[in-house]
């Protein structure tokens, strides 16, 4: 019997309790012998150099239409060597780059949070289709990752 495939979609980076669960749960799932793919937005606070992110050209290059506007979908990946796991990052300059997660530095929510969530969800689904990978279970962790 083949290993169950789990798609783990999270919104946070390790700065909160929710993010710590989002970091540890995929590892526990993998340690149980499941095949897992983890996705998260490439927030502006994620350091590409320190985390050794690189663009996956074969997965990038598509545009997603949100509210009648084309937005380029950029896919980046980082390997967690000690965990033998990869994390895919959904990136877009308008929605994620140079921004905090859901609120600005003054605590005010971004007006386009709904659009950002739609872009993220569609970006994950389109990327999984391009990977030709069909999960048995989809786990959405946090409201931004809700499908």
For each feature predicted by the language model, list its residue ranges:
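Nucleotide-activated donor-dependent transferases that construct or modify glycoconjugates
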Residues: 2-15, 40-42
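Structural motif
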Residues: 5, 136-137
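A short, glycine/small-residue-rich beta-strand->loop->alpha-helix junction that serves as a flexible
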Residues: 11-21, 47-49
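A conserved catalytic-core segment of Leloir-type glycosyltransferases
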Residues: 38, 42-130
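Short His-centered aromatic/hydrophobic patch
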Residues: 141-144
């Amino acid at each position: 019997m083949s290993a169950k495939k789990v798609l783990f979609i999270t919104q946070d980076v390790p700065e909160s309790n929710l993010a710590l669960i989002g970091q540890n749960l995929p590892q526990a799932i993998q340690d149980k012998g499941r095949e897992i793919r983890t996705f998260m937005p490439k927030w502006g606070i994620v350091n590409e150099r320190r985390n050794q992110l690189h663009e996956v050209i074969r997965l990038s290059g598509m545009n997603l239409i949100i509210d009648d506007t084309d937005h380029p979908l950029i896919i980046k990946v980082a390997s967690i060597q000690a965990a033998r796991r990869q994390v895919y990052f959904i990136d877009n300059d308008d929605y994620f780059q140079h921004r905090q997660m859901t609120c600005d530095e003054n605590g005010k929510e971004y007006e386009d949070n709904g659009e950002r969530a739609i872009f993220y969800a569609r970006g994950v689904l389109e990327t999984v289709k391009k990977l030709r990978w069909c999960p048995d279970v989809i786990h959405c962790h946090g409201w931004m990752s809700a499908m």
